[in-house]
């Protein structure tokens, strides 16, 4: 009879006095095996019970922690303004109320400095020091993995590549040379020119070649809906740059946030101008030979405000034009080096024909030529394929619907 419904049946042994020694030995062995099986099952159940007990203890601890958190009063966020002999002056976030208060006994006053973010209770007493606040959007702009673009992937703008490397890479890699010569390196580089000429690729190559951190953003990302958000994002962006130096900051399409100021009274235009003021202030705030280099790019140079173009902010204004015939030939070499090109393809003649083509247009041309070969079931790209691709893009351009239409008289 079992002691408990939850326990296995205890084996019972009845030996007949008339059994022989061999029968008695066999019965004892079978009884022993049943006892071992029952013991093994009890051990497993005990282990399961111990595991369940540990889970329940953990749940109880979590519930106690939640209960304590629910009973704890919420804190307010404030910034330390000044440390005095009478206490600490804080400014509460939200209402900007300034209060003279005290620290909690557990805090060490030597670890607190003006500007620190702190948590205060209902009595305004400082309870704990918080980490520095950085907008998550600014942190997301940091490029963790460098792009794969190299300077060898860029053609037709060798002079521009040299100027960018002088202004961005050399001050980071060899600042002593500038000090010995007695000059300050350019504090910023602005790349301007029509679309598709390699401005963004040049910035990607810098990110790949340099050992510095790389922060990439678009000017439109700084244009925010609510008042002050854009300026705050700019502050956090440059604060992140200061923490990551040496660093290269790349602002693409900067005309979205640095266009000429007007007399417009709309709230949207006013917010864009406030953001630009913060950007101008941050660009002026670094030492000339600091470890922060700024690259910006735009294809609307005519829209930029004069304040952002002055020396001290962007010391080098580098025009990135459409390539000449030698540059087009170099770009064709770059985009066809991995292609299976037939012997009848004359890249020199093709470069002569591609007048007014940008680097992006030439890349599109080589892709179209490859598509014509695939369409015919061939793995080799012939001169006829390039001619067909050229004709196709030219027809698209003339129709006014293609990616290269309207660039002949493009103003920048």
Swiss-Prot record:
Localisation: Cytoplasm
Record has ATP-binding as a keyword: yes
SMART domains xref list: AAA (SM00382)
Effects seen without this gene: Strains lacking panB gene alone display relatively normal growth rate and overall cell yield. Moreover, strains lackings both panA and panB still show robust growth, demonstrating that the PAN proteins are not essential.
Keywords: ATP-binding, Chaperone, Coiled coil, Cytoplasm, Nucleotide-binding, Proteasome
Binding residues for ATP: 196-201, 335
GO molecular function: ATP binding; ATP hydrolysis activity
Parts forming coiled coils: 28-74
Principal place of residence: cytoplasm
Region (Docks into pockets in the proteasome alpha-ring to cause gate opening): 409-412
Subunit organization: Homohexamer. The hexameric complex has a two-ring architecture resembling a top hat that caps the 20S proteasome core at one or both ends. Upon ATP-binding, the C-terminus of PAN interacts with the alpha-rings of the proteasome core by binding to the intersubunit pockets.
NCBIfam families reported in the protein's UniProt record: PRK03992.1, PrtsmActNtasePan2
HAMAP family xrefs: PAN (MF_00553)
Family designation: Belongs to the AAA ATPase family.
Notes on the domains: Consists of three main regions, an N-terminal coiled-coil domain that may assist in substrate recognition, an interdomain involved in PAN hexamerization, and a C-terminal ATPase domain of the AAA type.
Name of the featured protein: Proteasome-activating nucleotidase 2
Species this protein is from: Haloferax volcanii (strain ATCC 29605 / DSM 3757 / JCM 8879 / NBRC 14742 / NCIMB 2012 / VKM B-1768 / DS2)
């Amino acid at each position: 009879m079992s002691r408990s419904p939850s326990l296995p049946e205890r084996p019972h042994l009845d030996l007949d006095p008339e059994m022989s020694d061999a029968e008695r030995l066999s019965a004892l062995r079978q009884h022993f095996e049943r006892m071992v099986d029952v013991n093994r099952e009890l051990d497993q159940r005990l282990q399961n019970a111990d595991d369940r007990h540990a889970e329940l203890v953990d749940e109880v601890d979590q519930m106690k922690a939640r209960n304590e958190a629910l009973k704890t009063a919420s804190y307010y966020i404030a910034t330390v303004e000044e440390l005095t002999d009478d206490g600490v002056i804080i400014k509460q976030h939200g209402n900007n109320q300034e209060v003279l208060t005290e620290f909690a006994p557990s805090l060490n006053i030597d670890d607190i400095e003006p500007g620190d973010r702190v948590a205060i209770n209902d009595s305004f007493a400082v309870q704990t020091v918080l980490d520095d606040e950085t907008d998550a959007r600014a942190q997301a702009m940091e490029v963790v993995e460098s792009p794969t673009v190299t300077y060898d992937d860029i053609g037709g703008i060798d002079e521009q590549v040299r100027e960018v490397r002088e202004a961005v890479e050399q001050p980071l890699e060899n600042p002593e040379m500038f000090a010995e010569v007695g000059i300050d390196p350019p504090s910023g580089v602005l790349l301007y020119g029509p679309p598709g000429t390699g401005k963004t690729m040049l910035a990607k190559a810098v990110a790949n070649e340099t050992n510095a951190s790389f922060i990439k953003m678009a000017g439109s990302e700084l244009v925010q809906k609510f008042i002050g958000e854009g300026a705050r994002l700019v502050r956090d962006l440059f604060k992140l740059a200061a923490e990551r130096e040496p660093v290269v900051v790349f602002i693409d399409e900067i005309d979205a946030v640095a266009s000429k100021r007007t007399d417009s009274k709309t709230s949207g235009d006013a917010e864009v101008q406030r953001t630009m003021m913060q950007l101008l202030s941050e660009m002026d705030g670094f030492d000339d030979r600091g470890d922060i280099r700024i690259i910006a790019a735009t294809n609307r140079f005519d829209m930029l405000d004069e304040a952002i173009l002055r020396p001290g902010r962007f010391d080098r204004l580098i025009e990135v034009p459409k390539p000449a015939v030698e540059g087009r030939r170099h770009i064709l070499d770059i985009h066809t080096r991995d292609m299976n090109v037939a012997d009848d393809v004359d890249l020199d003649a093709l470069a002569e024909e591609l007048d007014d083509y940008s680097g992006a247009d030439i890349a599109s041309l080589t892709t179209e030529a490859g598509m014509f070969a695939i369409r015919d079931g061939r793995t080799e790209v012939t001169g006829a394929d390039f001619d067909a691709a050229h004709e196709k893009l030219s027809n698209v351009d003339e129709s006014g619907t293609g990616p290269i239409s309207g660039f002949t008289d493009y103003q920048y």
